[in-house]
Amino acid sequence: MDIRIGNGYDVHALAEGLPLWLGGVQVESPIGCIAHSDGDVAIHALCDAILGALALGDIGKHFPDTSAEFKGIDSKILLSRVIELVRSMGWSVGNVDITIAMQRPKLAPYIVPMRECMAKVMGIDVSQVSVKATTTEKLGFVGRGEGCEVYAVALLVK
């Protein structure tokens, strides 16, 4: 059995009055991510981790923010396309682990729905998808509520 590990990271600035999408789930919040797509920073980091595991570049290479095709796109579609590419190469997702850093809102009520949503898009069991949320104890741009960042790791198997 061959295995590959990929690491992903994404960050977005936050602004009032925008929808907040994380892990394919709309989170009730007065703030959301400024982005070309729907701004789902969790799925973007996950896509980068999966692509990175196979040395296929990053999300910007496959879905450039300069393309009108991806303006406002649902990030679940991007994840679905990444999974199609991975499967076409004979690989499958073993598991993923995602850490979301945001000062607010509290994300605990959304963790299970995020896991379920991303598992469904990837065609894997929810037990293979870990999502954790943390704050930065009010430190840095995340702590000041100016942005959110996500770290993701993906294990691929063949």
Enumerate the predicted regions with their spans.
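N-terminal charge/polar-biased segments
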Residues: M1-I3, V157-K158
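RNase III-family endoribonuclease catalytic core
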Residues: D2-V112, M122
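Acidic pyrophosphate-coordinating catalytic loop
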Residues: L107, L139-G140
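Generic structural marker for isolated residues within well-ordered, non-membrane alpha-helices
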Residues: R115
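Glycine-rich, mobile lid/loop segments that gate access to catalytic sites or pores
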Residues: M118
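Short acidic capping loops at alpha-helix termini that bridge into adjacent secondary structure
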Residues: D125-Q128
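Pyridoxal 5′-phosphate
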Residues: V131-T135
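C-terminal edge-of-domain segments
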Residues: V142-K158
